[in-house]
């Protein structure tokens, strides 16, 4: 495949003379900018002193346009004036690198950027980052710093603070986030701490993607010799401590459930794995089940550790206006999500057959005989009500 970028010039020179290594380059892009620089390493046998420069002049993101799809945009100007110093054991970098007049629209990023700039100032063995990204609905501010005075103990910190950052994950999720996050990196540890507020979200699930169907918890992978394959460990441990607040304008439309969600969660990750604690409430909702439009009277999803094992405590009732004798009839779902217990209930309390009759028909069993009772009993058995299973 031919690279869809035209070059006015590409030059590269390298050599070693009198114990000194030199590398020089020039890349001149047609109708765009230049990337040029040189690096020198003196006293190769001992001190390995570093010197050189890197310059990026008038470079724009037009060079990636050939790789964009229809309707996608990538605009911005990249510039750098950098100077290299120090030695191989303690490299120093001075100068400035920046991306300005940034505008990006594309399916490969979670949000559109209407205006943005990111600048990094290098101060020898430290650097400072600042930036601001504006989106159609909000913004994201970036600050950070890095320190490599000790190469084996370098560290970098980036803080992100934003408001109404509209994140789209087509076709199912549109969500506004107000992040207040701090990301820290060290040679042997990555950390993410902070808070994410979600004031608004629209989550619509038509079909469950194949990727969302997880493997069995007792699945064992085998190699070609039919021996168990040990799970791979991440090269750098990850720690996270996040507070997630779900606001008052978050709705879910999935598998017959239309509901408003609120709640607060704590996400923790360490070498033991990912943990989730907190509660999601369903203050209002409708659920289609058993051919009925049920109203969610109580809805709680509780997390206490494992992400994939929330505890359900949900009650959905038939519309009381369409139920005879002022009876409340509904479905109660309790227990762990992978093995919930489903019960038919009524207020006042009736037999399961009578309660199911009120739930499905809005009236009690015919007093005259056993036919209706037998039919309801058969339906209860068929539905598995009162048993643990994957009914919901």
Question: Which ranges hold each PLM region?
Answer:
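Glycine- and small hydrophobic-rich membrane-insertion segments that are intrinsically disordered
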Residues: 360-392
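Short flexible loop/turn segments that cap and initiate beta-strands
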Residues: 91-97
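Short acidic, glycine/proline-rich loop/turn micro-motifs
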Residues: 63-68
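Long beta-sheet-rich domains in secretory-pathway and surface-associated proteins
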Residues: 56-58
């Amino acid at each position: 495949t031919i690279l869809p970028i035209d070059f006015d010039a590409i030059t590269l020179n390298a050599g070693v003379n009198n114990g000194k290594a030199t590398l020089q380059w020039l890349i001149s892009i047609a109708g765009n900018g230049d990337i040029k620089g040189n690096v020198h390493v003196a006293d190769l046998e001992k001190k390995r002193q570093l010197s050189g420069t890197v310059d990026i002049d008038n470079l724009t993101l037009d060079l990636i346009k050939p790789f964009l799809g229809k309707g996608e945009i990538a605009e911005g100007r990249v510039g750098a004036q950098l100077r290299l110093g120090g030695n191989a054991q303690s490299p120093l970098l001075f100068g400035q690198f920046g991306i300005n007049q940034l505008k990006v629209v594309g399916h490969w990023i979670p949000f559109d950027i209407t205006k943005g700039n990111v600048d990094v100032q290098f101060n020898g063995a430290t650097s400072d980052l600042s930036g601001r990204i504006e989106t159609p609905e909000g913004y994201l501010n970036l600050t950070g710093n890095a320190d490599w005075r000790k190469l084996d103990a370098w560290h970098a910190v980036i803080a992100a603070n934003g408001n109404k950052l509209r994140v789209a994950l087509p076709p199912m999720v549109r969500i506004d986030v107000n992040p207040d996050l701090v990301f820290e990196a060290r040679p042997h540890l990555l950390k993410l701490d902070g808070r994410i507020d979600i004031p608004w979200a629209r989550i619509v699930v038509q079909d469950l993607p194949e990727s969302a169907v997880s493997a069995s918890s007792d699945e064992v992978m085998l190699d070609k010799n039919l021996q168990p394959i040990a799970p791979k460990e991440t090269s750098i441990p990850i720690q996270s401590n996040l507070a997630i607040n779900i606001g008052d304008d978050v709705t879910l439309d999935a598998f017959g459930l239309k509901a408003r969600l609120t709640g607060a969660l704590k996400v923790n990750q360490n070498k033991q794995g990912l943990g989730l604690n907190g509660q999601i409430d369903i203050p209002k909702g409708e659920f289609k089940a058993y051919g009925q439009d049920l109203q969610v009277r109580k809805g709680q999803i509780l997390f206490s550790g494992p992400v994939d094992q929330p505890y359900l405590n949900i009650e959905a009732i038939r519309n009381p206006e369409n139920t005879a004798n002022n009876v409340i009839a509904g479905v109660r779902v309790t227990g762990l999500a992978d093995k919930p217990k489903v019960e038919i209930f009524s207020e006042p309390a009736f037999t399961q057959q009578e309660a199911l009759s009120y739930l499905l028909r809005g009236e009690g069993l015919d007093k005259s005989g056993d036919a209706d009772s037998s039919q309801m009993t058969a339906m209860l058995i068929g539905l598995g009500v009162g048993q643990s299973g994957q009914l919901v």
